């Protein structure tokens, strides 16, 4: 059998981290009370009787706006530590940040040209 010396602790941690959630799920399935469908399946409407179904179709534009927002929100998360340590990092970090920003500007221009930012 192929073994890597020094990785025994990692393998043990990996096995335990896979076994604990699996054991929790199996235990929950075994000891949870079995309920019949009915009241549990209804949508909660703040004490009122539910009107209509719970499934609503959303316009795909909402997802496009959310995706663009998440991309630029992550950009802000990456740029903030760089801006805080700007004086200590030097010219190489400045060039790397410019490359990162330019890639995101190209992505924004692409989304703009494809109409992902237009609501029509």
UniProtKB/Swiss-Prot annotation:
Top EC class of this enzyme: translocase
GO MF term set: NADH dehydrogenase (ubiquinone) activity; quinone binding
Gene Ontology terms describing biological process: photosynthesis, light reaction
Record field: catalytic activity: a plastoquinone + NADH + (n+1) H(+)(in) = a plastoquinol + NAD(+) + n H(+)(out); a plastoquinone + NADPH + (n+1) H(+)(in) = a plastoquinol + NADP(+) + n H(+)(out)
Pfam families, per the entry: Oxidored_q4
EC number: 7.1.1.-
Keyword entries, A-Z: Membrane, NAD, NADP, Plastoquinone, Quinone, Thylakoid, Translocase, Transmembrane, Transmembrane helix, Transport
Role this protein plays: NDH-1 shuttles electrons from an unknown electron donor, via FMN and iron-sulfur (Fe-S) centers, to quinones in the respiratory and/or the photosynthetic chain. The immediate electron acceptor for the enzyme in this species is believed to be plastoquinone. Couples the redox reaction to proton translocation, and thus conserves the redox energy in a proton gradient. Cyanobacterial NDH-1 also plays a role in inorganic carbon-concentration.
Quaternary data: NDH-1 can be composed of about 15 different subunits; different subcomplexes with different compositions have been identified which probably have different functions.
Protein name: NAD(P)H-quinone oxidoreductase subunit 3
Chain's gene name: ndhC
